[in-house]
């Protein structure tokens, strides 16, 4: 299990440990930011949809080892992840509109 907030703290602790030992520190070339996190989330939604689509296609073609319950679970996971993505987008648009409507 991975907690996203802990990764940054863990990285800082590792940097401090390297500084204390006198080892030169290699800086990461790209720091994770909002855009990279958003892209990763969209890619994950896309992968989930592709997996569900592939499973459904295999079941339709009668490939052995592909059960209907697995296909239905994958399709539901895909649907839920897409709905979550849409809700996140709606919240982002709403927050953007709120900021744009603020008086300066």
Swiss-Prot record:
Its main location: other. Pfam families: FliE. It comes from the Bacteria. One of its GO terms (molecular function) is structural molecule activity. It is found in: Bacterial flagellum basal body. GO terms for biological process: bacterial-type flagellum-dependent cell motility. GO terms for cellular component: bacterial-type flagellum basal body. Keywords: Bacterial flagellum. InterPro entries: FliE. Belongs to the FliE family. NCBIfam families: fliE. This is Flagellar hook-basal body complex protein FliE. The gene is fliE.
């Amino acid at each position: 299990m991975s907690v996203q907030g802990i990764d940054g703290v863990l990285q800082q602790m590792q940097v401090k440990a390297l500084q204390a030992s006198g080892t030169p520190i290699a800086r990461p070339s790209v720091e994770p930011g909002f855009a990279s996190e958003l892209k990763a989330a969209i890619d994950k939604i896309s992968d989930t949809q592709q997996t569900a689509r592939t499973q459904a296609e295999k079941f339709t073609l009668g490939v052995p080892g592909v059960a209907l319950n697995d296909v239905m679970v994958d399709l539901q996971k895909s649907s839920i992840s897409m709905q979550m993505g849409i809700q996140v987008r709606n919240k982002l648009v709403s927050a953007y509109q709120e900021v744009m409507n603020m008086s300066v």
